[in-house]
């Protein structure tokens, strides 16, 4: 009986471990493992020509389906429609990555945080 109890306990732990890992990742608001930030930044720069650089990117999930993002986006000095640029960046994030809530800080000069 003790050996059988240990075997059952091991099976329960083994099957629950993935759920514990995923739950811990969500509770700690970790970044989604599938998201390639470099690829995402490159895609935004290609789709929105007024964007000349991206940094300070932070992505986390409140749930596996509810992703949040903050980023700094450097805008070309000659860009005139900053609101339109931000809308296109947000559309790319939502359409391609499912990031429905994003905060985009625009910069036309050096970042004040550096």
PLM segments and residue spans:
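Alpha-helical transmembrane segments and adjacent TM-loop junctions that form the membrane-embedded core
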Residues: 1-114
């Amino acid at each position: 009986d003790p050996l059988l109890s240990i075997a059952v306990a091991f099976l329960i732990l083994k099957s629950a471990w993935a759920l514990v890992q995923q739950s811990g990742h969500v509770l700690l608001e970790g970044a989604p493992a599938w998201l390639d930030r470099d690829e995402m930044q490159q895609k935004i720069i290609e789709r929105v020509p007024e964007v000349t650089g991206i940094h300070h990117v932070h992505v986390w999930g409140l749930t596996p389906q509810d992703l949040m993002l903050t980023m700094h986006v450097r805008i070309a000095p000659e860009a005139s429609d900053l609101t339109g640029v931000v809308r296109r960046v947000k559309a790319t994030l939502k359409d391609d990555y499912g990031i429905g809530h994003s905060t985009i800080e625009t910069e036309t000069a050096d970042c004040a945080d550096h």
